[in-house]
């Protein structure tokens, strides 16, 4: 329990490579999620009975070659893990035919690294402050430098930056509660969530809408409460909790457009098991 508390708020997605003496298993890869990398690699190498995965049990020893972290919560990390594992099914990755199968003579590690490289270039992941940590020098690869550009839609939003107070919902065009009315209501009673006016996390975006309108727009099948989504005006990615916090007056949310280096490549070869 203490070891988990020491790395509170750490959410990582890692890549393992098998160094099994058995040619059948050597070179196989495994992608997983963890809050404690040191504990997790030990579980994998001790087998399924010790908490390791069935797919890695008795097929090692396994080496954790890299881990991606910096996710805002476990949901975001788990979605990244799933997409990396399932490029043929992922809504974003399945549109890239070059990622649907390994190239000729490409190893499992090289294939997974190629998928990871493309994932870090696309939204929503290229807007997160992700860190890639390397643990094994022999597998270390340089990421191809490619300058990340702001989506065209985000530039269009700047033209309307002066519209700080909206009276109509951007989505349904219905009336919104004015800022002055909200302040008066706050003095008399606690606001209900349905009365909130939601605004984009991007300071230059003029989006203003009802809670229920945005929720209906970004709600995924099987969800009761939204987790994340893309702004219908500027296409900026957001976490639902951050949108609600901003509507409630929190001011510690950073504008995504200020993140000029959202992906940090941090080589750490002396960390590991």
UniProtKB/Swiss-Prot annotation:
Gene Ontology molecular functions: 5'-flap endonuclease activity; crossover junction DNA endonuclease activity; zinc ion binding
EC number: 3.1.-.-
The protein's name: Structure-specific endonuclease subunit SLX1 homolog
A GO CC term attached to the entry: Slx1-Slx4 complex
Assembly, per entry: Forms a heterodimer with a member of the SLX4 family.
BP GO annotations: double-strand break repair via homologous recombination
Transmembrane intervals: none
Domain GIY-YIG: 9-96
Function of the protein: Catalytic subunit of a heterodimeric structure-specific endonuclease that resolves DNA secondary structures generated during DNA repair and recombination. Has endonuclease activity towards branched DNA substrates, introducing single-strand cuts in duplex DNA close to junctions with ss-DNA.
Family stated for the protein in its record: Belongs to the SLX1 family.
Cofactor dependence: a divalent metal cation
PROSITE patterns xref list: GIY_YIG
Domain of life of the source: Eukaryota
Keywords carried by this UniProt record: DNA damage, DNA recombination, DNA repair, Endonuclease, Hydrolase, Metal-binding, Nuclease, Nucleus, Zinc, Zinc-finger
HAMAP family xrefs: Endonuc_su_Slx1
Pfam families the UniProt entry points to: GIY-YIG, SLX1_C
Organism listed in the record: Anopheles gambiae (African malaria mosquito)
Zn finger region (SLX1-type): 169-234
Glycoprotein in keyword set: no
Subcellular location per the Swiss-Prot or TrEMBL entry: Nucleus
InterPro entries on file: GIY-YIG_endonuc, GIY-YIG_endonuc_sf, Slx1, SLX1_C, SLX1_endonuclease, Znf_RING/FYVE/PHD
